[in-house]
Curated annotation (Swiss-Prot):
It comes from Clavibacter michiganensis subsp. michiganensis (strain NCPPB 382). [4Fe-4S] cluster 2 binds at C83, C87, C90. It is found in: Cytoplasm. [4Fe-4S] cluster 1 binds at C57, C62, C68, S294. This is Lipoyl synthase.
Length: 331
């Protein structure tokens, strides 16, 4: 794929053509990682290779793979490789998804078992083509991982299911350790960047999850045209909606077809934002240039449980152990 073509030979959208007029930006020197391959990472890498397992971590070339795999955490994508919605920052392509695969929950749970994961994040594409928008698939994947891996925590990073309380209730009923729904950006530019989503609806999804008794989580991506004051306002909105955990990251442009980077946020601003979010009252906060919403997810879950005065389930007490890894994403 070049700057002038789109995946699978489809025509470029007018927005993509306009985006492609701006060359890919050169990253500043502070956005870098070192490939520190600890023993747990190397063991997982070998297992994934020999067992033909698939995670978002390696397929999206996540910069935090060395650290997360060292802590036996990984992320899986369900529902297919194509999304029925298009967000201008997201590398997942938009199109007609593949047929519904009812065996996927079993396969994901089996991968979790074979990888010996301590904590698994499950995310899915939007499936507006389905009557339940993929709610059963999300819920069943959580249920199957829990059933087959009682010592593994599960976080679901979900679409908004159009805000439908019945569909959301199906997902909530699977009782993930954390329910995450990412707002990603601020109200003023939300519709331009996420045209199929609605800011207030996303906040309401988080509120519904909170009311269902779940630990809740969201993410903000900086560098897409927001102002610093708007970041503060979005943090307050999310906390007021019932969000327990927040991650904040730098936008990195996936290809010339995607939204150009508006600004590079310096590390000291992320430190400032983290302190601000903690002062607002979030129970768990990670902010940094290479933080991703699933980064150190098990640690943030354990931290939030302690802050709420809740006991970690006996089978998940290991998530409160001193963290392994190298903490590159926040530096």
């Amino acid at each position: 794929m070049t700057a002038a073509t789109a995946p699978d030979g489809r025509r470029m959208l007018r927005l993509e053509v306009r985006n492609a007029e701006t060359p890919i930006e050169r990253k500043p020197g502070w956005i870098k990682t070192t490939a520190r391959m600890g023993p747990e990472y190397q063991a997982l890498q070998q297992l994934v290779k020999t067992e033909d397992l698939h995670t978002v971590c390696q397929e999206a070339a996540c910069p935090n793979i060395y650290e997360c795999w060292e802590d036996r955490e990984a992320t899986f994508l369900i529902g297919g490789s194509q999304c029925t919605r298009r967000c201008d920052f997201c590398q997942i392509d938009t199109g007609k998804p593949a047929d519904y695969d009812t065996d996927e929950p079993r396969r994901v749970a089996d991968s979790v078992r074979r990888m010996g994961l301590r904590y698994a994040t499950v995310t899915g594409v939007a499936r507006d083509d389905l009557p339940d928008e993929g709610a059963w698939l999300h819920a069943e994947t959580v249920r199957r991982i829990h059933a087959d891996n009682p010592g593994t925590g599960v976080e679901i990073l979900a679409t908004d299911f159009s805000g439908n309380p019945d569909l959301l209730a199906e997902v909530f009923s699977s009782r993930p350790e954390v329910f995450a729904h990412n707002v990603e950006t601020v109200p003023r530019i939300f519709k331009r960047i996420r045209p199929a989503f609605r800011y207030e609806r996303s906040l309401d999804v988080i509120t519904q999850a909170r009311d269902a008794g779940l630990i809740t989580k969201s993410n903000l991506i900086l560098g897409m045209g927001e102002t610093r004051d708007e970041v503060s306002e979005a943090l307050v909105d999310l906390h007021d909606a019932g969000c327990d955990i927040i991650t904040v990251t730098q936008y990195l442009r996936p290809s010339p077809r995607h939204l150009p980077v508006a600004r590079w946020v310096r590390p000291e601003e992320f430190v400032e934002i983290k302190a601000e979010a903690e002062a607002i009252g979030f129970l768990g906060v990670l902010a940094g240039p290479l933080v991703r919403s699933s980064y150190r997810a098990g640690r943030l879950y354990a931290q939030s449980m302690r802050a709420k005065g809740r006991e970690l389930p006996e089978g998940l007490a290991h998530l409160a152990d001193p963290a392994n890894g190298f903490a590159q994403a926040v530096g």
